[in-house]
Swiss-Prot record:
Stated name of the protein: Putative glutamate--cysteine ligase 2
Gene: ybdK
EC number per UniProt: 6.3.2.2
Gene3D superfamilies recorded: 3.30.590.20
Record GO biological process: modified amino acid biosynthetic process
Entry GO MF terms: ATP binding; glutamate-cysteine ligase activity
Role, per record: ATP-dependent carboxylate-amine ligase which exhibits weak glutamate--cysteine ligase activity.
Superkingdom to which the source organism belongs: Bacteria
Family: Belongs to the glutamate--cysteine ligase type 2 family. YbdK subfamily.
Pfam families the record matches: GCS2
Length: 372
């Protein structure tokens, strides 16, 4: 399938997707009932969309194109109310978090969807193992070349995005010792990690054409890069975050990415080069393993910096951009989070260390999502 032309969109507009967990009380294992919920709510959603993801235990909430995080928050809040009522009607519950702490991948049912069934045929059990839950953020771009510049700029801050959203310390009933274990699930996919280097949109079109020769790629949606351009929407899509436990944190993460994009495309602070990616996977690993306590290394100078310190520096740099696009509240909230040292992964571990069970942990996450 040929790649569509890049559809120009209004710069810095926003779209957010949240992959939510559908769980079955009182055992709080993953349910296989997302289709039931989608059928129940499809005529009640007036803005945004509630839809399938890979398996029947995943429920995706997606906003329409939004001008700012306040509009996105309003759409999510309305969807959340409808979904929670439908879940209660069917004796189900909903929660965030990047992984379910004790589900077994062998039990997961792939959705009856042509694309997902084709993906199952290509990737086998890897697709069932990909029953993990992330937040994706789209940012509008005026051109394909702007999208490539923005993608490279945002890639510098992938460790920061992972660390701030880390919410997946448990998997398959085990403490993984990672703050964010979710990204590890995709390491076996041939397109895992950063997009191969291109310097402009024309080179990207050549790259996509080459990838299509493998017969495994029908569209951009079949590529699992950490950040990818989406020509159909005219956006760049950041895909590295765990789904947060609260709607407010999800909105704050979107505000961070929107403000960072505004700063990058307005100030053009970097002259991107392929060497920028030399230590990409090492820095990404530090964020996944240690969260904000990780240490990142500059591929050009060899300087090593604590992620906490570098994240505070980023928040300071983008504050003027955040003010211009209505995202200051997000930057202020994330600044408080970094200074306090609190993060969702550690809060989960604290709950278990205090005697809580993994079943109790999922129940608590459902209460948090419903109570906000």
């Amino acid at each position: 399938m040929p790649m569509p032309d890049f559809q120009v969109s209004e710069p810095f507009t926003l779209g957010i997707e949240l992959e939510m967990q559908v769980v079955n009380p009182p055992g709080y294992d993953l349910s296989q009932d997302s289709s039931t919920l989608i059928d129940a709510v499809k005529n009640q959603i007036t803005a945004g969309e509630v839809k399938h993801d890979i398996t029947e235990s995943m429920l995706e909430l997606a906003t329409d194109v939004c001008r700012d995080i306040n509009q996105a928050a309003g759409q999510f809040s309305a969807m959340q109310k409808v979904v929670l009522q439908a879940a209660a009607d069917h004796h189900l519950e909903i929660c965030g978090g990047g992984t379910h702490p004790f589900q077994k991948w062998q039990r997961q049912e792939v959705c009856d969807n042509e694309r997902y069934q084709r993906t199952l045929e290509n990737f086998g059990y890897l697709i069932q193992q990909a029953t993990v839950f992330g937040q994706h953020v789209h940012v509008g771009c005026a051109s394909g070349d702007d999208a490539i510049y923005l993608l490279h700029g945002l890639s510098r801050f992938v460790p920061h995005f992972i660390a701030l959203s880390a919410a997946s310390p448990y998997m398959q009933g085990t403490d993984t010792r990672f703050a964010s274990s979710r990204p590890n699930i995709f390491s076996a996919f041939p397109d895992n990690g950063p997009m191969p280097w291109v310097s402009n949109w024309q080179q990207f079109e050549t790259l996509f054409r080459c990838l299509s020769y493998t017969k495994m790629i029908d569209s951009i949606k079949d590529l699992h890069w950490d950040i990818r351009p989406s020509p159909h929407f005219g956006t760049v899509e950041v895909r590295v975050m765990d789904t947060p436990l609260t709607l407010s944190h999800a909105v704050n993460m979107a505000g961070l990415i929107q403000a960072t994009a505004h700063w990058l495309l307005t100030e053009r602070p970097f002259k991107h080069q392929e060497k920028d990616y030399l230590l990409y996977k090492f820095n990404r690993f530090q964020a996944c393993r240690y969260g904000l306590e990780g240490v990142i290394t500059d591929p050009h100078t060899g300087d090593r910096r604590p992620l906490t310190e570098d994240t505070l520096r980023l928040l300071e740099k983008i504050a003027p951009s955040a003010d211009k696009i209505g995202a200051s509240s997000a930057i202020e909230a994330l600044h408080r989070q970094v200074v306090s040292g609190l993060n969702e992964a550690q809060l989960m571990r604290d709950f278990v260390a205090d005697g809580g069970s993994l079943i109790g942990l999922v129940k608590k996450h459902c209460e948090i999502w419903a109570g906000e």
